Amino acid sequence: MNHFLDIHKTDTAELRQMMDSAHAMKAARKGRPKGQLDEDQPLAGRMVALIFEKPSTRTRVSFDVGVRQMGGQTMVLSGKEMQLGHGETIADTARVLSRYVDLIMIRTFEEATLLEMAEHATVPVINGLTNRTHPCQIMADVMTYEEHRGPIAGRKVVWAGDGNNVCASFLHAAGQFGFDFTFTGPSTLDPEAEFVGYAREKGRRVSIERDPAKAVAGADLVVTDTWVSMHDPQSARERRHNQLRPYQVNETLMAQAKPDALFMHCLPAHRDDEATSAVMDGPHSVIFDEAENRLHAQKAIMRWCLGL
């Protein structure tokens, strides 16, 4: 039994195994209807709980479709239904769910909730997102880069904007997959020192550059994310926009990157805020391949968790 809690907590060779599996499963589905089962149906007879304390469209649909394609069934539980940590303890919830299902995916706010769930569950637990990290997204992003440009090792990845949970998982991936990483954004939104330190300890070059044009110079991949959360009050939204406007990914900024550089955004996006529509729909953009690859990467993660 394997938990998938964070990229840096997983062996490098096993991450490579998952990545190769994701590419192979995607290739095997080429031309098939979306609802047609995979030939081997590795999850036949298995039940997967999808817990959403924090709601999501992409995570829910991609995991649900992935389980169904592999022959399994899903049970989707919202935060309101679960009352995580209120009343019944998370530990007891984990123990009970483990009696009903074969695998648990949880998308939650606090990392502590994820870790407690994994500590007490007797089935594998997958981190669908916490406020600190988003490893499933980055597995899809690395897959997408490899699909278009080959190995990501030795490449320069630039993150523009807020050093958030997705940025944190990119730093974990830099250490595991061997690419260099530059963050450009206001100092108040720098990624946590812990994440930067991890990538550096693994021998990767990690830099912080306040000038976005200098940061993006020679980049192989430019990535950004939303500037605001759905839960942010209006005052915080205005403050964030003022802070981050200089770090918008537009055509002028992308021109500083390599001619064959890719652009990624995990979506949903606020078009013409963190990135212009011209970039999102332009020749560098692979955002919809990136979105699709959540499905294939997560299928590979589920197989690995169950030892299939």
From Swiss-Prot:
Its EC number is 2.1.3.3. The lineage of its organism: Bacteria, Pseudomonadati, Pseudomonadota, Alphaproteobacteria, Rhodobacterales. Belongs to the aspartate/ornithine carbamoyltransferase superfamily. OTCase family. It is found in: Cytoplasm. It is an enzyme of class 2 (transferase). The keyword Amino-acid biosynthesis applies. Carbamoyl phosphate binds at S56, T57, R58, T59, Q83, R107, H134, P135, C136, Q137, C266, L267, R294. Reversibly catalyzes the transfer of the carbamoyl group from carbamoyl phosphate (CP) to the N(epsilon) atom of ornithine (ORN) to produce L-citrulline. It catalyses: carbamoyl phosphate + L-ornithine = L-citrulline + phosphate + H(+). L-ornithine binds at N165, D225, S229, M230. GO terms for molecular function: amino acid binding; ornithine carbamoyltransferase activity. SUPFAM superfamilies: Aspartate/ornithine carbamoyltransferase. This is Ornithine carbamoyltransferase. The keyword Ligase does not apply. InterPro entries: Asp/Orn_carbamoyltranf_P-bd, Asp/Orn_carbamoylTrfase, Asp/Orn_carbamoylTrfase_sf, Asp_carbamoyltransf_Asp/Orn-bd, Orn/put_carbamltrans, OTCase_ArgI. GO terms for biological process: arginine biosynthetic process via ornithine; citrulline biosynthetic process; L-arginine biosynthetic process. GO terms for cellular component: cytoplasm. It comes from the Bacteria. Keywords: Amino-acid biosynthesis, Arginine biosynthesis, Cytoplasm, Transferase. Gene3D superfamilies: Aspartate/ornithine carbamoyltransferase (3.40.50.1370). Pathway: Amino-acid biosynthesis; L-arginine biosynthesis; L-arginine from L-ornithine and carbamoyl phosphate: step 1/3.
